[in-house]
């Protein structure tokens, strides 16, 4: 018909296309959709595709000025979620032309920007994205990646060890630097600013950076190992963030840090570019992630936030522990840990991976395990996370009865014992406690740590299930 038909029509007439064959250049999304009572799943899935691409609530005559077929998102498959009533996985394909090159910000604004407040849905969760190689190639990704970081640090064949300096707020810069020095001298590779240490009245950023740099170089000179402290460059403005990163570089610090969700993807990508251009490693903290990813039926799964970070750029990112005080179920955690580190990841629904993902040689990100872990967890952590990880013990270092440096010694001895045992073919899952006990015979520091934390458990039911 020549005329334009005004009015409201069902989304599924335009946006539900089960016969569609996805293209290699499409961005694919898997949404967990909970429709309102009476809304059929096809309509709900189509509504998601429409509202996150070209659609609006009514027909508009300007639709005729473009080719909707070329630009619309399409819901191409719907399946019920096993064991859940009235919940569906809706698969949506987006043409690549809907997205600005090299902008995670634009990608997320399109895919999850508006549609989550949509009335026809009771709840909506983005479970996974398939990023096509054509789009990945528009991103720089991590400033350096796993191999380059190992070469810079000259550390191979084992996980790296870190420690978040506690109490996280309230120390003066001088005392803070002292704690950094003691931990690094004792045998850790890194120490870390807490995510909320920025520049507060009790410790301004410049003073902290100076004392931490002094601690790093003193510990390096004494141990003969390369050391680092994650200097948190997160700030209220991008200009201030740059100022902090520049000062870190001028001090000769090896690594800076950013809170990528509170700081935002635009700031994060800018900082990642600066870090690559200036030889700084970039540690990423995921503060605020649980606001977005903790609810099972609404929000975004962390694997999406992790993929977005690999595109935006970061050399380390916090990824749960499986064994500590914070959320993280084993198979699902390992699923997104692989998505961070590996170049090619096969679809595997049992691990929450909805799509095969090819990163086409984008550098990988080291997974950071942090939160309520101590020496007794070391065998499990070594087995679960493998070598390409950073194991961070805050209280598990600074809580040692003899002080910070002995706490660091205990962790390093425990780690080296676990790595050696693994390399000799022993089963860490079965013999873990025995390996730690053996090692503690030769290390009084480790023996004291074993005594303090022998009864600590964080046993709660996992929330992050399929």
From Swiss-Prot:
<keyword id="KW-0120">Carbon dioxide fixation</keyword>
<keyword id="KW-0934">Plastid</keyword>
<feature type="active site" description="Proton acceptor">
    <location>
        <position position="285"/>
    </location>
</feature>
<feature type="binding site">
    <location>
        <position position="318"/>
    </location>
    <ligand>
        <name>substrate</name>
    </ligand>
</feature>
<dbReference type="GO" id="GO:0016984">
    <property type="term" value="F:ribulose-bisphosphate carboxylase activity"/>
</dbReference>
<feature type="binding site">
    <location>
        <position position="168"/>
    </location>
    <ligand>
        <name>substrate</name>
    </ligand>
</feature>
<keyword id="KW-0456">Lyase</keyword>
<dbReference type="InterPro" id="IPR017443">
    <property type="entry name" value="RuBisCO_lsu_fd_N"/>
</dbReference>
<dbReference type="InterPro" id="IPR000685">
    <property type="entry name" value="RuBisCO_lsu_C"/>
</dbReference>
<dbReference type="InterPro" id="IPR036422">
    <property type="entry name" value="RuBisCO_lsu_N_sf"/>
</dbReference>
<feature type="binding site" description="via carbamate group">
    <location>
        <position position="192"/>
    </location>
    <ligand>
        <name>Mg(2+)</name>
    </ligand>
</feature>
<protein>
    <recommendedName>
        <fullName>Ribulose bisphosphate carboxylase large chain</fullName>
        <ecNumber>4.1.1.39</ecNumber>
    </recommendedName>
</protein>
<feature type="binding site">
    <location>
        <position position="286"/>
    </location>
    <ligand>
        <name>substrate</name>
    </ligand>
</feature>
<feature type="binding site">
    <location>
        <position position="164"/>
    </location>
    <ligand>
        <name>substrate</name>
    </ligand>
</feature>
<keyword id="KW-0479">Metal-binding</keyword>
<keyword id="KW-0503">Monooxygenase</keyword>
<dbReference type="GO" id="GO:0009853">
    <property type="term" value="P:photorespiration"/>
</dbReference>
<feature type="active site" description="Proton acceptor">
    <location>
        <position position="166"/>
    </location>
</feature>
<dbReference type="InterPro" id="IPR020878">
    <property type="entry name" value="RuBisCo_large_chain_AS"/>
</dbReference>
<dbReference type="InterPro" id="IPR020888">
    <property type="entry name" value="RuBisCO_lsuI"/>
</dbReference>
<dbReference type="GO" id="GO:0009507">
    <property type="term" value="C:chloroplast"/>
</dbReference>
<comment type="subunit">
    <text>Heterohexadecamer of 8 large chains and 8 small chains; disulfide-linked. The disulfide link is formed within the large subunit homodimers.</text>
</comment>
<keyword id="KW-1015">Disulfide bond</keyword>
<dbReference type="InterPro" id="IPR036376">
    <property type="entry name" value="RuBisCO_lsu_C_sf"/>
</dbReference>
<keyword id="KW-0488">Methylation</keyword>
<comment type="function">
    <text>RuBisCO catalyzes two reactions: the carboxylation of D-ribulose 1,5-bisphosphate, the primary event in carbon dioxide fixation, as well as the oxidative fragmentation of the pentose substrate in the photorespiration process. Both reactions occur simultaneously and in competition at the same active site.</text>
</comment>
<feature type="binding site">
    <location>
        <position position="195"/>
    </location>
    <ligand>
        <name>Mg(2+)</name>
    </ligand>
</feature>
<keyword id="KW-0460">Magnesium</keyword>
<keyword id="KW-0601">Photorespiration</keyword>
<feature type="modified residue" description="N6-carboxylysine">
    <location>
        <position position="192"/>
    </location>
</feature>
<dbReference type="Pfam" id="PF02788">
    <property type="entry name" value="RuBisCO_large_N"/>
</dbReference>
<feature type="binding site" description="in homodimeric partner">
    <location>
        <position position="114"/>
    </location>
    <ligand>
        <name>substrate</name>
    </ligand>
</feature>
<dbReference type="GO" id="GO:0019253">
    <property type="term" value="P:reductive pentose-phosphate cycle"/>
</dbReference>
<feature type="binding site">
    <location>
        <position position="370"/>
    </location>
    <ligand>
        <name>substrate</name>
    </ligand>
</feature>
<comment type="similarity">
    <text>Belongs to the RuBisCO large chain family. Type I subfamily.</text>
</comment>
<feature type="modified residue" description="N6,N6,N6-trimethyllysine">
    <location>
        <position position="5"/>
    </location>
</feature>
<keyword id="KW-0150">Chloroplast</keyword>
<feature type="site" description="Transition state stabilizer">
    <location>
        <position position="325"/>
    </location>
</feature>
<keyword id="KW-0560">Oxidoreductase</keyword>
<dbReference type="GO" id="GO:0004497">
    <property type="term" value="F:monooxygenase activity"/>
</dbReference>
<keyword id="KW-0113">Calvin cycle</keyword>
<feature type="binding site">
    <location>
        <position position="194"/>
    </location>
    <ligand>
        <name>Mg(2+)</name>
    </ligand>
</feature>
